[in-house]
């Protein structure tokens, strides 16, 4: 996993986003055991407290659960994962639409560009 961070937002928030993306994309499948806080903190080169805070946020969102003395796991509730996936997709779409509108494109023009892009992708 790419653990590069930027200064635009807190590191724990970026960790949450990266792990969430791994979960909703299936890289971390339902029921998968996650590495320990210390191991992941060392891997990402962040403070264990930062990693712990990210895990707490993921638990609060229902994407991760803890089992006493066994560790943390990705939820097995596929509905929660799908809802998180839809929410992330909505954020991406809103960001894309805002950027395209700033470039001066209308909704129809954006749709046309997307259709063109899809056709090019098929070729």
What are these regions (language model features)?
Residues 44, 78-79, 120-122:
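Short secondary-structure transition/capping segments
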Residues 24, 29, 60, 67-69:
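Short glycine/serine/threonine-biased micro-segments
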Residues 39, 74-75, 116-117:
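Short secondary-structure capping/turn micro-motifs that flank functional sites
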Residues 34, 66-74, 78-79:
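Short, Lys/Arg-rich nucleic-acid/phosphate-binding segment
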Residues 1-33, 87, 91-123:
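Extreme N-terminal segment that seeds HTH/winged-HTH DNA-binding domains in transcriptional regulators
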Residues 8-14, 46-56, 67-73:
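Short, mixed-charge, low-aromatic patches
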Residues 33-65:
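N-terminal helix-turn-helix
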């Amino acid at each position: 996993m790419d653990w590069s961070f930027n200064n635009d937002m807190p590191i724990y928030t970026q960790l949450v986003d990266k792990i969430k993306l791994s979960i909703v994309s299936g890289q971390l499948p339902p029921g998968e055991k996650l590495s320990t806080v210390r191991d992941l903190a060392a891997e990402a080169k962040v403070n264990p407290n930062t990693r712990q805070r990210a895990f707490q946020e993921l638990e609060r969102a229902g994407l991760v659960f803890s089992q006493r003395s066994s560790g943390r796991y990705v939820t097995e509730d596929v509905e929660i994962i799908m809802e998180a996936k839809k929410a992330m997709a909505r954020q991406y779409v809103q960001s894309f639409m805002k950027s395209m509108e700033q470039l001066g494109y209308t909704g129809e023009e954006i749709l046309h560009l997307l259709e063109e892009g899809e056709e090019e992708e098929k070729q």
